[in-house]
Swiss-Prot record:
Catalytic reactions on record: 6-carboxyhexanoyl-[ACP] + L-alanine + H(+) = (8S)-8-amino-7-oxononanoate + holo-[ACP] + CO2
UniProt cofactor(s): pyridoxal 5'-phosphate
Organism: Paramagnetospirillum magneticum (strain ATCC 700264 / AMB-1)
Gene designation: bioF
Pathway terms, separated by semicolons: Cofactor biosynthesis; biotin biosynthesis
Recorded family membership: Belongs to the class-II pyridoxal-phosphate-dependent aminotransferase family. BioF subfamily.
Amino-acid positions noted as binding substrate in the UniProt annotation, renumbered to this chain: 22, 139, 356
Subunit structure: Homodimer.
Keywords: Biotin biosynthesis, Pyridoxal phosphate, Transferase
Record bears the keyword Heme: no
Residues the entry annotates as binding pyridoxal 5'-phosphate: 109-110, 187, 212-215, 239-242
General function of this protein: Catalyzes the decarboxylative condensation of pimeloyl-[acyl-carrier protein] and L-alanine to produce 8-amino-7-oxononanoate (AON), [acyl-carrier protein], and carbon dioxide.
Protein name per Swiss-Prot or TrEMBL: Putative 8-amino-7-oxononanoate synthase
Amino acid sequence: MKGLDDSIGRFLDGLDQAGRKRVLRPVDPLPAGRVRVGGRELVNFSSNDYLGLSRHPEVVERSRRWLNEYGAGSGASRLVTGHLAAMEALEAKIARCKQTEAALILASGWQCNASVLPALLDKALWGAEPLVFADKLIHASLHAGLELSGARRYRYRHDDLDHLESLLKAHADKEGPRFIVTETVFSMDGDVTDMAALAALASRWDAFLYVDEAHATGVLGANGFGLSPGMGAELAMGTFSKGLGSFGAYVACSARLRHYLINRASGLIYATGLPPAVLGAIDAALDLVPRLEGERTRLQMMGRRLRDGLRAAGLDTGPSASQIVPLILGDEGRTLAVAKALEDRGILGIAIRPPTVPPGTSRIRFALSAVHSDADLDRLLAAILDAVEATP
């Protein structure tokens, strides 16, 4: 194609000039929350492996066992021959964990949100165009699903349930079903939704409640299975790639809704089923998570300790209340410089900049893990204070 390289080159040059050109850096995972980058060992405070399950011996062993028993791949989409009997049993286990009638496994969190939401919001299903009320800071995959759906969308101020209710009131005369879309733990700020208040509001307005539990799964709630169980959310999705240490996503919902999604969600219909090794890792993680209450408690204590230390130094950690603690620096250049200074001190903390976060809120997002030691946390806090002081 004529002009392709020139067009792409101009685009990449523009990103470079704006300081926003992303590159991929090879990383070698190591035990105990470490990684090797560019030949150097760093303490990794940017991974979502919150419980360290990606290297847990039971997870690795069951993954290996299912690989040996069922082979390297599922071989087809689930509606053909890729729906393994082991996957059917695994979905029943997920449903029990989430206290729902049924569950459905999909290939990734992005694929889940980007295909389930358009299926749910199909005007042909409801006989009228749905109205969606979404938190302003929901994940890009949720925005993508809503955009693909074409439904009417209204954004409420982040975590502001009063504003949400005012929007529901303002549009009460409009025809069509109501949907509320949000997250229980927000990935960039680390704040936690008041699930009880949100569920009560959804019930008052007869709204379908869709919650993304990607960063709560494994970490929060009774037995570590998130904040949605028992709260009446019509659909809770989550991932296996963070607190559960492997890969993939799930939807927990009613049996009838599961059957509908099997017939309408493109991310399931047209995608090859997850490989057996991944399913085995998920199965083991689900067995382990209820036994890790001590690790979850310690993880939250570590989050409080890091927030307290940073706030005592006058640094901005936003509304964080979880294992995700942002250091909000605002300026993109300074954020990159502090991240580099941390790396020089043996700490991996990735700079998060627009468009991932709003302009003026660039930050380093620290993700804590149960495998980090108290000494690791001491080292992190000291390195942050030193790096910030050295990078005015």
